[in-house]
Amino acid sequence: MKQIITHVTHYRYTAPVTYSIQTLRLTPRDDEHQRVLRWHIEAPGALEQQVDAYGNITHTLTLNRPHTEIELRVVGQVLVDPLAQGALGGEDSRLPVHAYCVQTALTQADDTILAFARAVLPDGLNTPADVLTLATAIHDRVAYEPGTTDVTTAAGQVLALGHGVCQDHAHLFLACVRGLGVPARYVSGYLYTTNEHAASHAWADVWLAGTGWTSVDVTNRQFASDCHCRLAVGRDYDSASPVRGVRTGGGEESMEVSVQVQTALQQ
């Protein structure tokens, strides 16, 4: 599928910011499953490109002049191939696979999470069918309800609350999978969809012996497909988020995000 993507993020501040630095993970990688045809980031300053420890393309934006707003505008086209049961295979990674067994503050598996995972998969997680079984169980346990959590909500809180959004589904899934001793990683990206879910999306990859990385969209109870454009991977939201930054000054901050994903047929 050829995806045409427009992503605008606008930050506004109630007082001047004297210095800010942001890390942008807003550029998809070329790999055997997706090809970037055209991509451009428009920002109010020079961008310094790097590749981080997870293999993500990042840009650093530094502003050392007073400002009361920042607008980041991304436009591009990506050709995404279909995946057979979400299989990505053994793609190259800067980190060893077992590095993705490490839990984080957002994905820590407490006793309740471990009991939930073991009840769903008493024989462990070994096959693509197991991946989908766990995704479905989480989907059924945690209702999709925007505005009830934020990016600091940890997996244990998500399970207790019983509602959340895509990053919450992904964090709980990662907690369960790593709790079962299987490597898994967080994925941020875009989703072409006609339903109520936002086009900015999050899902997860699981490492299966003999298969490699298998990608699953927990929120939609399905394997990732050519509707999913990958931006970044990490251990959790914090290491794969589209934008992370710090600033001096600025007072209160507000943010508006607009994401549109179309197919070539819609143009």
What are the roles of these predicted feature ranges?
Residues 1-84:
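Intrinsically disordered, low-complexity N-terminal segments that are enriched in acidic
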Residues 9, 149, 219:
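Ser/Thr-centric signal marking residues that sit
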Residues 19, 26, 43, 56, ...:
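Generic structural "secondary-structure junction" signal
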Residues 21, 168-251:
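Hydrophobic/aromatic-rich core segments of domains that either
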Residues 25-27, 42-44, 75, 205, ...:
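Residues in well-ordered beta-strands of folded domains
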Residues 47-50, 98, 223-230:
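Short, surface-exposed linear segments at secondary-structure transitions and domain or protein termini
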Residues 80-82, 93-164, 172, 237, ...:
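Secondary-structure boundary elements
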Residues 84-91, 216, 243:
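Short, charged, solvent-exposed linker or helix-capping segments at domain edges/interfaces
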